[in-house]
Amino acid sequence: MLVILSAIVPVGFIILIGVIAGKILTVEVHSLSQITVYILAPALVIDGLYRTTLSASNIGLILLGFALISLVMVIVVEIMAYCLSLDDDTRKSLMAAAVMPNNGNMGLPVASFALGAAGLERAIIYMIGSSILLFGISPAYLLGKSFLSGFRLVFRLPLIWSIFIGISFQTFSFHLPLQLDKSVSYLGQAAIPLALIILGIQLSQQKLAIGKLELLGVCLRLLVAPLLAFAIGNSLGLTGMDLKILILQSAMPTAVNTVILVTEFGGSAALMARTVVVTTLASLLTIPFFLWLLKVYL
């Protein structure tokens, strides 16, 4: 239990600092988010891929596992929306809540604290898949456009270009001169605490309200998704750390950026904001549970 607490308490502590900062300071969250998205997160990806010990097979299976989990979750939500006769905005919001995990602000720190460097490098791979879904495919879905237009959006992301750079450095054994690799590493390390602080600030600006749809979002995001990850991971033959990361990252709460997405591209922003808060708070209970399961059974 102490090992599990030592993984989740540091994460909760930094989020709490962000909540306090959001209450007592005048903080421009948008600027902090831009720094993370355009500088720190790409640096983390470049550094992670540059130093990775994972094989192409490992990387491919983790990404395939994420894609299959997302696809099944989409089907589940569409069926539930039809059975519950949900309106279009509510359906889109529930879809965003269920399918888009917070792998950046929450997933990477938890993986780092709980599973160390081996877990973090795999969590970065998972985050690449979720970023493509969150910032590329999802806007196209919410707008009712084709997936081709979604992939056009994907290639505007700095994170995608950082993937190409990181893979190129690793493939051709390119070494940055003048210890610039350390600079990239330091920038990447800054992404994790800043992401948690941003999450805390964003939570401080939202109201807590729990209704049936919010609870449904919690069940889908925090319970169904990780159980589905276990089933799909086993069917793909994933074992050890690869399977642990697939399950753990699938157990993350709803991504904070979904509020921005539904506001801009369609959906209920109010429902989305409430769901983000509820799933994030609930995840502080469910994540330790899944960490315990991973420790005992995997």
Give the predicted meaning of each segment.
Residues 1-298:
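Alpha-helical transmembrane segments of multi-pass small-molecule/ion transporters
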